[in-house]
């Protein structure tokens, strides 16, 4: 059984649209896939010939030595989420904070004469 349960689309840091991913998976004769975008629940349309498992990748940090302020980061893969689950609302808030952070970075770069438009973030 060939499966791929860790795929990113253009909704995250991947390069393919969701429909393209599903088409490629069918061409590769994968039996199951999960699109696990960062902090974004991508739910492709169901298709005959392939099982699509809802998934998401979430970033997390923890204090590796209690009280030391030394943190390690990990990415957690979560499967079988529903679109309206409580975690998806929380992750939407995280995405919005990241968007605002990126806009602030662009403003600071522009002040240093490194010209980047906010619209370039969507590419």
Locations of the language-model features?
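A metal-dependent hydrolase metal-coordination microenvironment
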Residues: 1-120
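Conserved acidic, metal-coordinating active-site core of Asp-based
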Residues: 123
């Amino acid at each position: 059984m060939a499966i791929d349960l860790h795929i990113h689309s253009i909704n995250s840091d991947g390069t393919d649209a969701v429909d393209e991913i599903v088409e490629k998976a069918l061409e590769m004769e994968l039996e199951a896939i999960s699109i696990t975008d960062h902090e974004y629940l991508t739910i492709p349309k169901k298709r005959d010939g392939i099982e699509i498992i809802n998934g998401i990748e979430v970033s997390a940090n923890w204090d590796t030595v209690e009280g030391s302020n030394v943190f390690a980061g990990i990415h957690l893969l979560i499967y079988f989420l529903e679109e309206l689950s409580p975690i998806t609302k929380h992750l939407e808030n995280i995405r919005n904070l990241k968007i605002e952070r990126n806009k602030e970075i662009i403003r600071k770069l522009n002040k240093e004469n490194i010209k980047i438009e906010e619209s370039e973030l969507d590419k």
